[in-house]
Amino acid sequence: STPRLEGFSMPPEWAPHECTWMEFPPANKEFAADPAELAAARATWASVANTIARFEPVRMVCNLGESHISRELLDPAIELFETTTGDAWCRDSGPTFLTHPDGRLGATLWTFNAWGDRGFSDPTDERHVGVFIAGLAGAEVFPSSMVNEGGGIHVDGQGTVICTETVQLEIGRAHV
């Protein structure tokens, strides 16, 4: 079955939601080339998370064994969850949440290939993060064979989809 056939749809950005999900930057090729760069990335992520936490709950996924690092930088109200991670772009590799008129939560799990397997990070470390987050959120899971980055699509809740050409159509990135 598909989310649409089951009555689910992707809500617009401004729709009410329970919380914001984020991933804390792990040491990987993108962030850890220089310890100062990794520290700066972590401080930036923490600043964003701490700002969001002033207005709504934040749930942060941290790489296994690294929650103590994020805890030092994050507001105590931010919930931490540990699992193996490979990157910090939860919007791209995490679930795309869906809503149902009866209040149920769903999640599309795209096939994530780390931006076309360009070597920024190992996509195998990220592919389970969507399942992990969807499980914690209690969402009904809809796996998709479509290679996609969740951050590459936006909807208005009225049937309009805005997508990025580089994500959806770039050969190698989207395996078109």
Where are these regions (language model features)?
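The feature marks the mature, well-folded catalytic cores of soluble enzymes
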Residues: 1-173
